[in-house]
């Protein structure tokens, strides 16, 4: 589908009209906990989308090509920071300079507090394909071109880091579509659907992702609000299409209003609108609604669980980490196609100790393979063998870094395996009995039940011992202390 056809749909037009009428008058209660991204927190009530931008906060730091620190926190500072990153990225990509393009991409991720895309970016750069891939994607995602959403089926990876890279390379105002922006627009759409007289299945099921803390980023947590599909449940290409769809909607909306006129031309106005959504999406309680107790999100097929709604603490899908890595290496040596479906087929067809895995169990074993964890599919055999071997070298290979940088927890629920190692190491360091450790994990809010706490620690032990972060007694090692120095889960 092309832009004009998309915007001509009655429900899309009605949603844009609803936004134009309601966004200036809605009141938002911004309540941010103190964190490294928002030092001191934020408590303010504002009316209207334009007023939200005045309270933009995202404390970040990255290093330019001369290794000088570039710091930002306010919207004005962030604009300057992103302008530098955009120029660096654009220069590298258009010159075909793979190393400059790669370094710009890595610093964009550092600014955004995300790291999942690092292995993918390194692989593209090593094969000399990074610049050409980003240029191809830029053409497919431009908001002012005659492109078709179907053409985005060629997207190889997409996550909260890559959306930032693609948005910064774009010149037409393409939004960064992360969990917070997705949550905000999904909430606005849910409110629109409550008031709209039209019928039929929801046309604009904007996806979102989970927060690192107890913030709500799925409208389905509120009574009679449509739940947002989770990033983990949709294809990479579909996530990219939602970035384009949202961009089309924002340009159409700003084209009929004077909002953010002081920001400059249309692309700058689009990014100001996106930044305001980013602030609203931190916690959807800002819309003034009270979440349903033990909320069950309302999905297209009825109720779905809290986990599917993106509220599952730091509980992973249980899996035997070391064994799955060894299985994957054997699978790669078999010569089968290197993708999830083929690996799941292989796992189901290979009995273990006389037992055959169910397909659901085999799919669960792929938890650490996603781009949100270690992005293992597509690794070279040489790198994979280092990862399977484990230890510090295996961890560096898994994280695609020549040196082991201190682990940081971003704003979203990603890197669950490594967070679980951190939680597990701390649990064993402070408590001697199983009950005390389980109580610690549950009381801290990392898991909701005793069983889920045990699943969390089982994965934490498995991953931690594999990479030498935990010893045989599951206690933190010197490598643990080095890797997690300064790490905090406070959100």
Model-derived regions: residue spans:
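Catalytic Zn2+-binding segment of zinc metalloproteases
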Residues: 165-180, 188-193
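Helix-hairpin-helix
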Residues: 147-170
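Short amphipathic alpha-helical interaction segments
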Residues: 353-363, 448-462
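Accessory beta->alpha helical hairpin/"wing" motif in late/C-terminal subdomains of nucleic-acid enzymes
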Residues: 367-398, 471-488
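Short alpha-helical segments that sit at the start of domains
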Residues: 307-323, 395-422
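Long, highly charged, low-complexity intrinsically disordered interaction regions
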Residues: 54-151
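C-terminal accessory module of base-excision DNA glycosylases/AP lyases that mediates lesion recognition
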Residues: 1-55, 179-184, 192-318, 453-459, ...
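Short helix-coil junctions and helix-kink-helix linkers
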Residues: 346-354, 439-450
């Amino acid at each position: 589908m092309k832009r004009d056809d998309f915007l001509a749909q009655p429900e899309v037009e009605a949603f844009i009209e609803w936004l134009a009428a309601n966004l200036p008058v809605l009141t938002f209660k911004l309540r941010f906990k103190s964190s490294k991204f928002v030092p001191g927190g934020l408590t303010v009530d504002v009316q209207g989308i334009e007023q939200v931008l005045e309270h933009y906060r995202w404390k970040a730091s990255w290093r330019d090509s001369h290794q000088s620190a570039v710091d930002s926190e306010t919207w004005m500072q962030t604009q300057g920071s992103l302008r530098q990153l955009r120029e660096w990225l654009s220069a590298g990509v258009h010159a075909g300079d793979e190393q400059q393009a790669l370094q710009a991409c890595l610093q964009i991720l550092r600014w955004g507090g995300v790291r999942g895309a690092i292995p993918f970016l390194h692989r593209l750069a090593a094969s000399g394909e990074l610049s050409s891939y980003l240029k191809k994607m830029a053409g497919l995602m431009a908001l002012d071109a005659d492109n078709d959403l179907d053409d985005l089926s060629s997207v190889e990876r997409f996550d909260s880091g890559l959306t930032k890279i693609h948005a910064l390379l774009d010149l037409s105002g393409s939004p960064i579509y992360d969990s917070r922006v997705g949550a905000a627009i999904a909430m606005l759409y849910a409110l629109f659907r409550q008031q709209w007289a039209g019928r039929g299945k929801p046309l604009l099921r904007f996806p979102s992702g989970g927060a690192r803390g107890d913030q709500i980023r799925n409208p389905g947590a509120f009574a009679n609000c449509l739940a947002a599909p989770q990033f983990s449940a949709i294809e990479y290409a579909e996530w990219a299409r939602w970035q384009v769809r949202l961009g089309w909607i924002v340009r159409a909306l700003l084209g009929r209003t004077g909002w953010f006129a002081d920001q400059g031309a249309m692309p700058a106005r689009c990014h100001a609108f996106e930044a305001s959504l980013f602030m609203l999406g931190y916690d959807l309680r800002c819309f003034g609604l009270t979440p349903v107790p033990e909320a069950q999100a309302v999905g297209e097929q009825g109720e779905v669980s809290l986990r599917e709604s993106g509220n599952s603490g730091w509980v992973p899908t249980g899996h035997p980490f070391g064994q799955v890595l060894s299985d994957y290496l054997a699978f790669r040596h078999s010569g089968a196609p290197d993708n999830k479906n083929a690996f799941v087929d292989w796992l189901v067809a290979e009995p273990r100790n006389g037992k055959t895995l169910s397909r659901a169990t085999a799919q669960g074993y792929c938890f650490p393979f996603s781009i949100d964890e270690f992005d293992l599919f597509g690794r070279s055999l040489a790198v994979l063998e280092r990862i399977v071997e484990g230890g510090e070298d295996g961890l560096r290979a898994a994280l695609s870094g020549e040196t082991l940088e201190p682990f940081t927890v971003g704003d979203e629920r990603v890197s669950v395996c490594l967070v679980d190692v951190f939680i597990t190491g701390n649990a064993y360091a402070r408590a001697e009995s199983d009950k005390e450790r389980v109580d610690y994990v549950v009381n801290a809010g990392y898991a909701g039940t005793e069983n889920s706490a045990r699943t969390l620690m089982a994965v934490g032990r498995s991953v931690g011992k594999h990479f030498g972060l935990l010893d045989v007694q599951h206690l933190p090692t010197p490598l643990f202390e080095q890797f997690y120095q300064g790490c905090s889960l406070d959100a």
